[in-house]
C-alpha cells in the first residue's frame, strides 16, 4: 500500500549524516521524511563519545555555520572541551569535546522533533522505486510505498553489516541493531561500483573497576570553550576529566601470541580498516618497535560508569580482550561491560557521485556518510548537510551547490572523494586542505553563513547574530586603523616599554598589531578600551597578523579560478580528443569530472592533458557558435 503522504525528500538513516540531511532539507522549506529503523537511536554516537579534533572540528564549525545541529548538540552534551594544537598557528588549531552520549542524543532528537517540515517514521527501507533511471520513492520493510522526488541514503555501517568478535561473526548494523540486507542487495543491482570496508570499536570498561590513581589526569581547558557560534558555556553540563595510561610489553605479548585468532590476520575480514584509527592488533603488528601506545580513558557520560578506552579497538576473542585490558596499568581488575568488535559493511565508490552527492546514474538518489567510504561523525554530518541541501534544491528546481576547495573543508572532503575515490575509510585532516590558512575553524561562519542564508539553511536568529559579529569586526578594524599612538605620549611610552625600543614615529593601532611582539589583549591593555567580544577580537587579530599570507593565498585562488570553474560537458567523448593517451582517456572516462579543475586532480592526468582539454573545449565552443550562426 502507499503511505498517506508524498514527500519531496526522503532521508534513510538517522545517524549523523541522516539527521543533518533531514534537518537541512526541512530548514529549506521542503517536505521531508526521515526514515529510521529505530527512533530511539536517532543521533546515536556508535563509536567514541567525542566530537571534533584535528580537521574534524573545522567540519563541525562549517556544519554549524550553515545552520546544522552537531555543534549545538555538542554544547548541550559536552562534558570536556580542549583545544588541540594550541601552540601552533590558527589554521591548524582544533576544538575537541567529550560528549555525554545520552545528552548528545537527546539534544539531536529535540532539534529533530521541533523542526518544521520534517516528519519522522520508524521503518527500515528494503527497496528503492526506480523508473527510467530516476528514483521515485522507497519501499519499507512492511511493504509501504512512500513516494518522493529525491532520496538521500545515509546507511552508515548497516549495508550488509557483519560483526566480528574473534573467529565468530554475525549479521548486524552495529552491536544490538540488525543489518540492512535487502537494501544492500537492491543497491548491488544498480550500476554502481561497490566494495567492503571495516571499522572497529574497543571494549567498554566499568569505571568502578579502574584505578585512576596510577593514571595521568587530563582535564579540560579553562576558560571552557564552546563548539557552536551560537553556543554558550551556560549550556554545558558538568565538566569532567579524561585519563591517560599505556599499553606495555605484556600487552603486546598477549596480542602477538593471539594474532592467529584475529579475524583481521586470519583472512576472515576482507574489508580495509581506517589507516588513522587502527586496531590495537594492527598497531602492534605495524609498529613492532614501539614499547607502548597511549590509551585515553574517556567517560561515556555523567550518569554511567562506562568508560571508552580510546586506542585499543579490537576484534580479538573476548578472552583475549580481557587479558589485554587487564595487562594495562590501572585496569588490572577491570570489568568489561561490552566487548570490542569489528564490523564490515558495503560502501560505494564515491567517484560515481556528482559534487552534489547525487549519483551519476540514478537521478535524485543521493549518498552521504560511510556509504561513500568515509569514517567519523563529522565527515558524515558534513556530507549529510550537503546531500540534504542538494536534494531540497532539486525539489525546488534550483541549481545544486557545493563549496569549492578554497571555500570550505566540506569542499575539500567532497572533491577528494569524487575525484580520487578511496580504498580505505577516509578521515579529514587539516593537511588535506591546500588553503588551510583561509579555511580556519574560527572563521567558518564568515565563510559560509551568508551562503547558508541564501540557500535557506540559516534562520533569523543565527543570521542576526552573524550580522552583528561581522559588523563588530569591521567597526573594530576601523577603530584600530583610526586610533594613533605618538612618541612621547603616555600611550607611546607604554608601547615603547612593551617593545623594548622607542617609537620613532606615530603608528595606528592596526599597524602595531601586525608586530609579532604584541597580541590584541596586550595592545588594548596598553592603549585603552577594546572590543568586549573575544570572538570579534580573535578575528581582528588573526586577519591583521596574517594579512600578507592570506592575501597571497587569495591571489593564488583567483589565478586558478578560471580553469577551476570551467565546466566539462556531460556528453564529452574523451576517446575523440587527439593527443590524449589511452590511459588518460580511460581515467577521465571513468571519473567523468565535472570541471577542468577536478580533471586536473585525477592521479595521472598531466598538465599537458589539461591543455589539450582546454583546446578541445575552445574548438567545441567555436564549432557550436558556427552551427548556430548558420
Swiss-Prot record:
User: Where FAD is bound, by residue?
Assistant: 13-18
Coiled-coil parts of chain:
none
The alphabetized UniProt keywords are: Cytoplasm, FAD, Flavoprotein, NAD, tRNA processing
Reading the lineage from the top rank, the first entry is Bacteria
Q: Name one GO molecular function term.
A: flavin adenine dinucleotide binding
Positions that bind NAD(+): 273-287
Co-factor requirement: FAD
Which SUPFAM superfamilies has this protein been placed in? FAD/NAD(P)-binding domain
Q: What Gene Ontology cellular component terms go with this record?
A: cytosol
Q: Which GO terms describe its biological process?
A: tRNA methylation; tRNA wobble uridine modification
Where does the protein end up?
A: Cytoplasm
Gene3D superfamilies reported for this sequence: FAD/NAD(P)-binding domain (3.50.50.60), GidA associated domain, C-terminal subdomain (1.10.150.570), tRNA uridine 5-carboxymethylaminomethyl modification enzyme MnmG/GidA (1.10.10.1800)
Explain the purpose of this protein. NAD-binding protein involved in the addition of a carboxymethylaminomethyl (cmnm) group at the wobble position (U34) of certain tRNAs, forming tRNA-cmnm(5)s(2)U34.
Please name the NCBIfam families in this protein's record.
Answer: mnmG_gidA
Subunit info here reads: Homodimer. Heterotetramer of two MnmE and two MnmG subunits.
Recorded family membership: Belongs to the MnmG family.
What name goes with this protein? tRNA uridine 5-carboxymethylaminomethyl modification enzyme MnmG
What species is given as this protein's source?
Pseudomonas syringae pv. tomato (strain ATCC BAA-871 / DC3000)
From the broadest rank down, the organism's phylogenetic lineage runs:
Bacteria, Pseudomonadati, Pseudomonadota, Gammaproteobacteria, Pseudomonadales
